Amino acid sequence: MLLFLSTLTLTFQSCKGKSSSNLTAATDSLSDDALMDTVQRRTFLYFWEGAEPNSGLAPERYHVDGVYPQNDANVVTSGGSGFGIMAILAGIDRGYVTREEGLARMERIVSFLEKADRFHGAYPHWWYGDTGKVKPFGQKDNGGDLVETAFVMQALLAVHQYYAGGSPQEKALPATACRCGRQGLFPADCRLHSIGVRQGVPA
């Protein structure tokens, strides 16, 4: 695990153009706890600061320079957002933001997920974050995506467990997360899987 985290940190830091000797010295001086905190904090910040403003979800692409040649700054990814939701929960737990700030973000995210396009209960690969409408993944892939939906469902389970024992306001969030999850019972998807379709659910 430590080797994995060290490699991940080196990868992040190499983007800054430092020499490899400086990188080794920087990570060698970190304790295991400090290294874990660095990785978790930077992961959290990507999903917190880089979120699409309306939905609060993870962008499909994040251009540091703010230039989006394909005019897709508002496109969000369902699977990446599943990772992001769990990273935000970790960030709340570690005190990177207050519980109140975290709850407000989670309420925005879960509200978006409850209203966004779905197909037989499955979420699409991409949405337009400002509308919740599907952005087709390809010419013949404009419906639900089972793999990406699994990441969202896992995140909704984490939200439910994290807030289930919280304040009265926090306890309202698991109910919404459950409603989203219950819509994810996919008999149509199971039939598709049985005939060899692994990813797409038709629109």
What annotation goes with each model-predicted range?
Residues 1-25:
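Bacterial Sec-dependent N-terminal signal peptides
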Residues 23-73, 120:
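Low-complexity, Ser/Thr/Pro/Gly-enriched N-terminal "stalk/linker" regions
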Residues 25-35, 45-46, 82-97, 112, ...:
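Well-ordered alpha-helical scaffold segments within catalytic/enzyme domains
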Residues 32-35, 39, 73-80, 144-151:
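Secondary-structure capping and boundary motifs in well-ordered enzyme cores
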Residues 40-56, 104-121, 175-195:
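Long, well-ordered core segments of solenoidal/helical folds
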Residues 54-60, 96-102, 166-173:
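Surface-exposed patches in mature extracellular/periplasmic domains of secreted proteins
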Residues 74-82, 86-142:
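Membrane helical hairpin/interfacial module
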